[in-house]
Each structure stands twice: as C-alpha cells, then as structure tokens.
Regions:
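Flexible "cap/lid" loop of the alpha/beta hydrolase fold
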Residues: 59-63, 105-129
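Serine-hydrolase catalytic machinery in alpha/beta-hydrolase-like enzymes
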Residues: 1-79, 167
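Catalytic histidine neighborhood in serine/cysteine hydrolases
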Residues: 45-49, 152-167
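Catalytic histidine-centered segment of alpha/beta-hydrolase-like enzymes
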Residues: 59, 161-176
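Conserved alpha/beta-hydrolase "acid-adjacent" motif
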Residues: 30, 114-115, 136-147, 166
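Short beta-strand/loop motif that positions the catalytic acidic residue
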Residues: 127-129, 133-136, 140, 157-158
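Active-site nucleophile loop of the alpha/beta-hydrolase fold
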Residues: 24-25, 53-56, 104-113, 137-139
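Gly/Ala-rich beta-loop-alpha elbow adjacent to hydrolase catalytic centers
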Residues: 82-94
C-alpha cells in the first residue's frame, strides 16, 4: 500500500528511555493532549520521538505507525520503549502487542470497522502484563466504556468528553480532563522508568 510522506522529530533525553508519540489524522502532536504528554515525558528525562505527517490526510497510516515502533526497537533494542498514541495512532496497538510495548492510548478506536483487532491487541497486552492505559470520553462515538473496562487495562473514562477529550461548552471540565490525561501519562512513564526489565 502507498504511504504518504512523514518525518520523525526527536528530542534527545535518556537514550535508554524512548517514548514514541503517534498523532491522529487531524489531531497533530501540537494538540494539547499530545503536547502536554510530550512535555511531561521530556521533563522526566525521556527521549521523545514524534511522528509528524507532511500531509493533511495520510495514506498507509497503519503501516507507518507499525514501522515506526519496529524501527525504534530494532535501532535501540536495550532501551525501554513507551508509546503515546492518539486516535488514528492507536492503529499501532497490534504491533505494540507483538513487541510487548507499554502505552497510553488516547481515544482508541474501540468502535467502528477498525475496532476488532485493536480490542484484541489490548486484551493481549493486558494478559501479558504489559502496562496499558486507555483514555476516552463518553461523548465520543469511537470510544466504548464497556469494552475499555472489560479489557482489564487502566481506564480513564471522562464523562461528556468528545474525541478530543474536551467537554463541549465546559472549559473547566476540559482543562481538568487534560490534566488527568497528562498526569496518567506521566505516572505510566515514571513506572516504566523504574521497572526492572525482564
């Protein structure tokens, strides 16, 4: 399948801890969820690699996301890896499961045609004991509180939040949700930084 152009921007930190940020289609890494998560990771000393699409509507996203994870592990096999993905970026879930990679999956596609393999991958990650965070909002048609909670993953279920994890017409609730997500990502990263590798 043809893929569109992209590049990976890297902010160097500890070479033994690498976080990979996978944006959505219309939600770039400059969006608040990924931007603040990136700041939290950098503040904690992680090397952060951010995938940036060079087109508005990327083709072949699934393959690009998968290759980005595999390439990072191949290039840095001794490093701890963590993925933070938003929406379309959660198409990388099956490869994360294959690699045993911990992750924070923001607004994962738990409903719709893309959902079945992603739900399976989440269950595989949880069954394997790989730390997995799912964050979504009850106002998002692509999110399923039921499937998220049944998976056994850590779940941040935000009442009334849409696919951007914002609560329409309620800026205070939206800011609170942003803080919850950023804290959850920071906590997950902190755990991975101190967990003994197998």
């Amino acid at each position: 399948m043809a893929t569109d152009a992209f590049h990976v921007h890297e902010e160097k930190g500890d070479p033994g801890r690498i976080a990979i940020v996978l944006p959505g289609q219309a939600y770039t890494a400059q969006g608040p969820l990924l931007s603040y998560a990136t700041h939290a990771l950098l503040d904690a000393g992680w090397t952060v690699r951010v995938l940036i699409w060079d087109v508005a509507q990327p083709r072949g996203a699934r393959e690009v996301y998968a290759d980005t994870l595999r390439d990072s592990v191949r290039e840095h096999p001794e490093a701890r890896h963590l993925v933070v993905a938003k929406s379309l970026g959660t198409l990388a879930l099956p490869v994360a499961s294959e690699l045993g990679m911990p992750g924070a999956w923001l607004t994962p596609l738990l409903e719709g045609p893309a959902a079945p393999p992603l739900r399976t991958a989440i269950r595989e990650l949880v069954t394997s004991g790989v730390p997995t965070l799912l964050a979504g909002g009850t106002g998002d048609s692509l999110w399923s509180t039921e499937h998220a909670q049944a998976s056994g993953a850590r779940v941040l279920d935000i009442a009334g939040a849409d696919h951007s994890l914002e609560v329409p017409g309620q800026w205070r609730a939206s800011l609170h949700a942003l803080g919850q997500v950023t804290t959850a990502v920071a906590d997950l990263a902190s755990e991975q930084a101190t967990t003994r590798r197998p």
